[in-house]
Swiss-Prot record:
Organism: Human adenovirus D serotype 9 (HAdV-9)
Function: Major capsid protein that self-associates to form 240 hexon trimers, each in the shape of a hexagon, building most of the pseudo T=25 capsid. Assembled into trimeric units with the help of the chaperone shutoff protein. Transported by pre-protein VI to the nucleus where it associates with other structural proteins to form an empty capsid. Might be involved, through its interaction with host dyneins, in the intracellular microtubule-dependent transport of incoming viral capsid to the nucleus.
Induction: Expressed in the late phase of the viral replicative cycle.
Misc. remarks from the entry: All late proteins expressed from the major late promoter are produced by alternative splicing and alternative polyadenylation of the same gene giving rise to non-overlapping ORFs. A leader sequence is present in the N-terminus of all these mRNAs and is recognized by the viral shutoff protein to provide expression although conventional translation via ribosome scanning from the cap has been shut off in the host cell.
Lineage, highest ranks first: Viruses, Varidnaviria, Bamfordvirae, Preplasmiviricota, Tectiliviricetes
Subunit structure: Homotrimer. Interacts with the capsid vertex protein; this interaction binds the peripentonal hexons to the neighboring penton base. Interacts with the hexon-linking protein; this interaction tethers the hexons surrounding the penton to those situated in the central plate of the facet. Interacts with the hexon-interlacing protein; this interaction lashes the hexons together. Interacts with host dyneins DYNC1LI1 and DYNC1I2; this interaction might be involved in intracellular microtubule-dependent transport of incoming viral capsid.
Name of encoding gene: L3
Protein name: Hexon protein
GO CC aspect terms: host cell; host cell nucleus; T=25 icosahedral viral capsid
Alphabetized InterPro entries for the sequence: Adenovirus_Pll_hexon_C (IPR016108), Adenovirus_Pll_hexon_N (IPR016107), Adenovirus_Pll_hexon_sub2 (IPR044942), Adenovirus_Pll_hexon_sub3 (IPR016110), ADV_hexon (IPR037542), VP_dsDNA_II (IPR016112)
Length: 943
């Protein structure tokens, strides 16, 4: 290696753009200036359209992007490992920042994938309307106890006659035949054809019905595949050997209006013919929520079953392919090693935050609300109107009517009459039939018949049920009677089958307030079909269950993702996960392993770009970078060691102890709370207990439990109080929220303390004074405190001071009685009657009330800033010395006070440390990396 004295005095050059946090350490303005005429360094060496204008010796130099095929593959049940040999030729420099893995394979999203709300089949049918069906039963009034076939249905298609051949639908007049045309039974009468207009009346009608062997389902959601090109759906009959024949399973049943006579005989000529058939009936996207009995067989009772659409479940790869590549997992890390030295430049730590760091880095570089399909970059989001309900009622001042199709709505007919000549018409005898007027005139008396529906209220109520009620915790739901659900509560079938009483989240709940439902606060709001980012990523793959995918996956590991690789030969390998719960994300969060999803990788290639430099320029750059004064240094964006501390269910206190160490270069703490169920074990290649596929806050930053913290106290063993005791509350105790606020310490009409608000403004934006100041736009990004802080308040009945208060439980509350279902999303029942809930909080009769306050702050990590200089700023002794002066190593004790939760959770605590890697490439095929981390040199925060 050349000695420094032999090298020219290069000035510094920053190659990563103004706000990038990672850059080549010393090096290269003079170099940039010298080469600027034919190669601009403007966009971090990455403009693939720029090629050198001179000194190009071969056409190979112009070939900027190369594909590397793996030299070794290892495809196992849970992972796919690909190894590449990167050969960087002389006078070339490979830009690792431009590399990506190009992966092709096949994805089966499983039967739980449903990329839409509602149903695709007969969505306009009433939820409880049956298909035209038959069943076997005894006649109710007949003495004969034999089982007979009963038919219920619609015969919509008119005809001119009915004979043994069926319904006559026309006459063949070609070649003077004049022969009747009968319905072709394999597809006629067609269900979509009927009377064409209001006056279209025939004497004979035909229709189709499902035979008793086809088990009844409501029309809403029913589908039967066609069995011929005309759209007919009848099954084929089988012969004695069980082989399918070419004959359809169709039987004609004839029906006559009872009571007619022909002469002395009873009139029995058929008026209706029903073509009964068996079909392949299925309900691909609905399920039954009301079932009168346990049997699925066709019966009169099952005519009144009621359907509900299956819950939407979008499934796609995670944001920026989180979870697809192994990071921070011992034994599964990658390799980037020079073949000459075999030293691996990738040194992984389980407590590094590679995925989360990448998410936050992207947020600092640009607008995360803009989707970038190539890296599958569409950030998880939720509809703010679902998380926090602004219930301002409905604007339904005008009634909404629906009218009969004929604009009258009556079938009453009237005889034309007139007054006899010379009479005045005041008695019946003065009237006679009018021969000039028809004997049957259809006239409507009074106003047009109409029915009223409150469209606005129904839309609002429907929104609340679909978006809020169905996402309530499972403890608020029940299984409909006579419906059997699987025991595994993580399956789609179980989640889909559970229903909730609509009155739990109705239009009158918290009316007039801006408030989130208390049970919903601790439910992951990103696991929702209105997660626009997930919906976009799901739709990128298409709308079918089976997907041949072709994706491009970036490298995120901070030490090598921006590296300039100098000439030599290198081994590069990485592991890719195949665990569907880790690499796929679903909006319901069901266990995709159990629900039949799978992934297969067919090929993993690596694409890499060389800098388009003239050879002599590249060799100059190489010579510079080989010099150890120009080693490449990279900071981890988060620069933090993380630690997960378990919080048992119902626990409210979390003590933490860190053994004595030197706190030099320590910047502070970030913390939030995670659910154990939603946090995989990164240390294992495959976590068998991770039975969940929703958003993973630990990796993707979808935090939502920040509001559950009450206090945090921080104490170093020296017991030095926090420097600069100018905070509102106790120096070493941070009170985050207080429910009883006698001193008026809360802020923004919620229960967050002014103290905590100021600490957050200080640590996020360096706004450390009390005054109105909004952070600059480039600081106030998607994951920032100011953007996500949501204060709320509401009034509720004062149960203590209102003497007439009665705690009426849900089954005994009624509101909209007669117009809604009782405690179920089923047919309306009851009678119109005054509501008994909720108590009025407004008007002349407003009852005594109390105010409740709270806040939500999602996506953010709470931060407490710290400077290791504080250790030298404690209270001075009589000698004018700091007590800490003699001993610079200190133990740390922290205590977190949190709200109790019904399930085990984790405290996710980041210690903001100095985390940097220095990469040195002294010779061909040699790459050395030094990782520096202080105060936690390696491992996790407990070592």
């Amino acid at each position: 290696m050349a000695t420094p004295s032999m090298m020219p005095q290069w000035a510094y050059m920053h190659i990563a753009g103004q706000d990038a946090s990672e850059y080549l350490s010393p090096g290269l303005v003079q170099f940039a200036r010298a080469t600027d005429t034919y190669f601009s360094l403007g966009n971090k060496f990455r403009n693939p359209t720029v090629a050198p204008t001179h000194d190009v010796t071969t056409d190979r130099s112009q070939r900027l992007t190369l594909r590397f095929v793996p030299v070794d593959r290892e495809d196992t049940t849970y992972s796919y490992k690909a190894r590449f040999t990167l050969a960087v030729g002389d006078n070339r420099v490979l830009d690792m920042a431009s590399t990506y893995f190009d992966i092709r394979g096949v994805l089966d999203r499983g039967p739980s994938f449903k990329p839409y709300s509602g149903t695709a089949y007969n969505s306009l049918a009433p939820k409880g309307a049956p298909n035209s069906s038959q069943w076997l039963a005894k006649d109710t009034n007949a003495g004969d106890q034999a089982l007979k076939t009963h038919t219920h249905g619609v015969a919509a298609m008119g005809g001119t006659d009915i004979t043994a051949k069926g319904l006559q639908i026309g006459v063949d007049t070609t070649e003077n035949k004049n022969e009747p045309i009968y319905a072709n039974e394999i597809y006629q009468p067609e269900p979509q054809v009927g009377e064409e207009n209001l006056q279209d009346v025939e004497n004979f009608y035909g229709g189709r019905a499902l035979k008793k062997e086809t088990k009844m389902k409501p029309c809403y959601g029913s589908f039967a595949r066609p069995t011929n090109e005309k759209g007919g759906q009848a099954k084929f009959l089988t012969d004695g050997d069980g082989q399918l024949t070419k004959n359809h399973d169709i039987t004609m049943n004839f029906f006559d209006t009872p009571g007619g006579t022909v002469g002395q005989d009873t009139e029995l000529e058929a008026d209706i013919v029903m073509y009964a058939e068996n079909v392949h009936l299925e309900t691909p996207d609905t399920h039954v929520v009301y079932k009168p009995g346990t049997s699925d067989e066709s019966s009169e009772a099952n005519l009144v079953q009621q359907s509900m659409p299956n819950r939407p479940n979008y499934i796609g790869f995670r944001d920026n392919f989180v979870g697809l590549m192994y990071y921070n997992s011992t034994g599964n890390m990658g390799v980037l090693a020079g073949q000459a030295s075999q030293l691996n430049a990738v040194v992984d730590l389980q407590d590094r935050n590679t995925e989360l760091s990448y998410q936050l880095l992207l947020d600092s570089l640009g607008d995360r609300t803009r989707y970038f399909s190539m890296w599958n970059s569409a950030v998880d989001s939720y509809d703010p109107d679902v998380r926090i309900i602004e219930n301002h009622g409905v604007e339904d001042e005008l009634p909404n009517y629906c009218f009969p199709l004929d604009g009258a709505g009556t079938n009453a007919t009237y005889q034309g009459v007139k007054v006899k000549n010379g009479q005045d018409g005041d008695v019946n005898a003065d009237w006679e039939k009018d021969p000039n007027l028809a004997s049957r005139n259809q006239i409507c008396k009074g106003n047009i018949f109409a029915m009223e529906i409150n469209l606005q209220a129904n839309l609002w109520k429907s929104f609340l049920y679909s978006n809020v009620a169905l996402y309530l915790p499972d403890s608020y739901k029940y299984t409909p009677a006579n419906v059997t659900l699987p025991a595994n509560t993580n399956t789609y079938e179980y989640m889909n089958g559970r229903v909730v009483a609509p009155s739990l989240v109705d239009a009158y709940i918290n009316i007039g307030a801006r408030w989130s439902l208390d049970p919903m606060d601790n439910v992951n709001p990103f696991n929702h079909h209105r997660n626009a980012g997930l919906r976009y990523r799901s739709m990128l793959l298409g709308n079918g269950r089976y997907v041949p995918f072709h994706i491009q996956v970036p490298q995120k590991f901070f030490a090598i993702k921006n590296l300039l690789l100098l000439p030599g030969s290198y081994t590069y390998e990485w592991n890719f996960r195949k665990d569907v719960n880790m690499i796929l994300q679903s909006s319901l969060g069901n266990d995709l392993r159990v629900d039949g999803a799978s992934v297969r990788f067919d090929s993993v290639n690596l694409y890499a770009t060389f800098f388009p430099m003239a050879h002599n320029t590249a060799s100059t750059l190489e010579a510079m970078l080989r010099n150890d004064t120009n080693d490449q240094s990279f900071n981890d964006y988060l620069s933090a060691a993380n630690m997960l501390y378990p919080i048992p269910a119902k626990a409210t206190n979390v003590p933490i102890s860190i053994p004595s160490r030197n706190w030099a270069a320590f910047r502070g703490w970030s913390f939030t709370r995670l659910k154990t169920k939603e946090t995989p074990s990164l240390g294992s290649g495959f976590d068998p207990y991770f039975v969940y596929s929703g958003s993973i806050p630990y990796l993707d930053g979808t935090f939502y439990l920040n509001h559950t913290f009450k206090k945090v106290s921080i104490m170093f063993d020296s017991s030095v109080s926090w420097p600069g005791n100018d905070r509102l509350l106790t120096p070493n105790e941070f009170e985050i929220k207080r429910s009883v606020d006698g001193e008026g310490y809360n802020v923004a009409q919620c229960n967050m303390t002014k103290d905590w608000f100021l600490v957050q403004m200080l640590s996020h934006y360096n706004i450390g004074y009390q005054g109105f100041h909004v952070p600059e736009g480039y600081k106030d990004r998607m994951y920032s405190f100011f953007r996500n802080f949501q204060p709320m308040s509401r009034q509720v009945v004062d149960e203590i001071n209102y003497k007439d208060y009665k705690a009426v439980t849900l089954p005994f509350q009624h509101n909209n009685s007669g117009f809604t279902g009782y405690l179920a999303p089923t047919m309306r029942q009851g009678q119109p009657y005054p509501a008994n809930f909720p108590y009025p909080l407004i008007g002349q009769t407003a009852v005594p009330s109390v105010t409740q306050k709270k806040f939500l702050c999602d996506r953010v990590m709470w931060r407490i800033p710290f400077s290791s200089n504080f250790m030298s700023m404690g209270a001075l002794t009589d000698l004018g010395q700091n007590m800490l002066y003699a001993n610079s190593a200190h133990a740390l004790d922290m205590t977190f006070e949190v709200d109790p939760m019904d399930e085990p959770t984790l405290l996710y605590l980041l210690f903001e440390v100095f985390d940097v890697v220095r990469v040195h490439q002294p010779h061909r095929g040699v790459i050395e990396a030094v990782y520096l981390r202080t105060p936690f040199s390696a491992g996790n925060a407990t070592t």
